[in-house]
Amino acid sequence: MKMPEFNGPAKGADRRLMGAGVPAFLLVAFCLGYALSHREEQTLTIGVFAGSNWNVPQGETYAVIDAAVQKFSAQHPGTRVVFESGIKREDYGEWLAEQYLQGTEPDVFSLLEEDFNLYASMGALMDLSDAMDGDTDFNTDNYYPAALRCGVYDEKSFALPVENNVTLMFVNKTLLSRENIGMPAGDWTWQDFLDVCRKVTKDTDGDGVLDQFGCYDYSWEQAAVSNGARLFREDGQACYFADGRMEETIRFMMELQALNRGMRPSARDFDTGRVAFRPFTFAQYRAYKPYPWRIKKYSSFEWDCATMPVGPHGDNVSVCQTLLLGMSARTQKQNMAWDFMKLLCYDREIQRLILQKSQALPSRRDVVLSAEAAEIFHWDAEESAVTPPNLDATMLNAVMPYRFPQYRAAMLYADAEITKIIDGVTPRMNALNKLQKEINAVLQR
């Protein structure tokens, strides 16, 4: 029996099936591609402000951020990094607070030093401890201890240090040279400082009025830090103004002030070259030392910077000011956010760029001690006091600023009372004991 032949669908039916199948296939492929592309494309939002954090001119406002974004995007294809430009530093705190209240804060954002404790205490920041401990490409030993500690709250890490600033001592080299005095040594002491100030403080025109001075704007707090004095307990529940190191600080400041015979040097005296020393931040040094800013500021005399003079029980210590970077506790992109934080705060290339494009110090110690840093600081071939080893020592010795809620109020009161002691308005005998009791009573309420 002959089997029936099967020749498939009719010719017209074949065309109809093919005609229907091709568009269906293309539609499925298009939908699949669209879904995959949109699933892979992600946006990371960051919060930054324009300009310097240190109140000095900065030409290339977003140079470091732009470089970090470009490198991050290359490492994370399909990812967009977005930030709102043009926010001034003085407006940034309010802007960030508004974003947080609206629930639209960035995934990653800069934290002003004065705001860190607030955001950490209210649970707005992601605890980074696990990410830091679990990342084999991340080692906290590469950071300066004080900078890293600035991002710690309640013994947990909530932020990474981006860049730092420390206080140095501005030295009027022209004035010292005129008095046959050399630049201070790297380990100079209070006594060295006092001796130079005594020698240069004088009436140069013979009218009976002092017109040249040793120092301007040097505070008892800066002296206390360099003498190893600890003013407060870290949690702000106690103060230590009656400590022997503070007694030494007050005596030193009284002796220093007595050189001026009741006169107070002014900013104009300093600007016109009639003052030998003034505390000066590293950011100010970086901004005003090289051309062209040195022509616009302090151009009438040669100057440099040295470390802060050391007290009998201290070291050449400065308070470390740090710009921090935190992660929102509400972000849904924790891994991506951590990668960006690590890139900006830890990547050697980006940290080197902080030296090149900003007025701040990187947070990585090996970058400060690098050959590139030596080239950047080599402005004065004769005798620059600001060298990588000196800055490294300053950062290693640096201490954290106090950040407990009542700090500003306590310091305002302490400053007023200590100024009275130094000025001789309040007798020094037992004054610090009394001050300690008064401030402790307020702190422990």
Short names for language-model regions:
Residues 154-162, 167, 191-239, 275-277:
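Extracytoplasmic/periplasmic solute-binding protein
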Residues 2-118, 312, 425, 429-445:
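Conserved N-terminal structural module of periplasmic/extracytoplasmic solute-binding proteins
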